């Protein structure tokens, strides 16, 4: 057999050296004196919508045309239109009860008016029965958990996924504050520290101390927040400021969650140094916010695109391009009119 293949190759049949028979012959008689073996490694493949999903964000309490507070049932009526526009994932900012203590007003005003709902990211407030609810509760005025389940069911009927915001911080009215004060930072006088991002101050929010002496119990509880919503049909999440929490927590938490929920998709909202954004991708975040919003000229877009798609980052960092967010509206959109909005939408959808 070998001589026949040699003769065919010498007569100009180049394929003879590449045939299945000769390959099997070489494999069978190859020397094995230097052969080594290694462990079999598992390869995790991202869900399809982590690779190509289009996200649509809206506040469910604004889903009515009049001035009334909408419910999640009202919001569900908008889902067919979102599907028709071509989106795959509907992202809801926090739907939890909102704290009343130190509630903020419009434009981060230090006091709220009688009709101001407060910031949805000030998580933790009073439920209809007078008890306090937190990250595992739905705001009563949105319809409670029953309305949330109906919203998710309707989205799934249309082929849409629902994404929830995970913001690990608490209003002064959150049950964690009363039940686990050791999970928070304390001032010398014993009071709890509020969140700050100078020059901004967020008196309506207490940051969580991930390095508390009671960190094992804290970490397990925070992981259970994901598990709670997974049980309600949500496997896609947007994480608020993950770079301000320990990397070790995310690596452990996301690995544990994917043991039972491999279809998990987690978007990192981390506007920080590129190296930090890339590290979050390496430890388990499928997608990441980017600086697309601030790249507007052809030169800026070209340079930024090359840094994302023509470097080794393409192997592990999957960028999301958002034309705007609830708290970021670039001057190009403020003053550019409808044409600017359309062009940024097209760029975000096609780059």
Short names for language-model regions:
Residues 52-57, 62-70, 98-151, 178-216:
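Aromatic- and acidic-residue-enriched carbohydrate-binding clefts of CAZyme catalytic domains
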Residues 44-45, 76-90, 152-156, 307-312, ...:
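Short amphipathic alpha-helices and their capping/turn segments at secondary-structure boundaries
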């Amino acid at each position: 057999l070998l001589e026949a293949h040699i003769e065919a190759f010498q007569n100009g049949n180049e394929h003879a050296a590449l045939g299945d028979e000769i390959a099997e012959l070489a494999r069978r008689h190859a020397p094995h004196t230097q052969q080594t073996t290694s462990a079999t490694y598992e390869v995790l493949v991202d869900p399809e919508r982590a690779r190509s999903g289009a996200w649509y964000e809206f506040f469910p309490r604004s889903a009515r045309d009049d001035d009334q507070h909408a419910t999640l049932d009202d919001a569900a009526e908008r889902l067919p239109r979102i599907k028709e526009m071509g989106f795959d994932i509907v992202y809801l900012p926090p739907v939890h009860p909102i704290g009343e203590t130190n509630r903020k007003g419009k434009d981060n005003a230090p006091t709220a008016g009688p009709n101001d709902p407060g910031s949805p990211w000030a998580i933790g407030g009073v439920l209809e029965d007078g008890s306090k609810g937190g990250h595992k509760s739905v705001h009563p005025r949105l319809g409670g958990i029953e309305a949330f389940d109906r919203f998710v069911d309707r989205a799934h009927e249309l082929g849409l996924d629902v994404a929830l915001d995970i913001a690990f911080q608490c209003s002064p009215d959150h049950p964690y504050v009363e039940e686990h004060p050791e999970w928070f930072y304390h001032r010398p006088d014993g009071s709890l520290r509020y969140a700050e991002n100078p020059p901004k101050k967020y008196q309506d929010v207490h940051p969580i101390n991930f390095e508390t002496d009671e960190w094992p119990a804290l970490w397990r509880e925070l992981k259970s927040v994901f598990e709670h919503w997974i049980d309600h049909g949500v496997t896609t999440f947007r994480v608020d400021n993950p770079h301000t929490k320990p990397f070790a927590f995310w690596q452990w938490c996301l690995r544990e969650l994917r043991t039972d929920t491999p279809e998990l998709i987690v978007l990192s909202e981390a506007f920080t140094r590129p190296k930090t954004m890339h590290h979050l991708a390496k430890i388990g975040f499928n997608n990441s916010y980017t600086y697309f919003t601030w790249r507007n000229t052809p030169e800026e877009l070209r340079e930024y695109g090359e840094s994302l798609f023509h470097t080794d980052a393409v192997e592990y960092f999957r960028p999301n391009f958002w034309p705007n967010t609830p708290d970021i509206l670039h001057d190009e959109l403020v003053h550019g009119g409808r044409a600017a909005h359309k062009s940024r939408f097209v760029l975000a959808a096609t780059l």
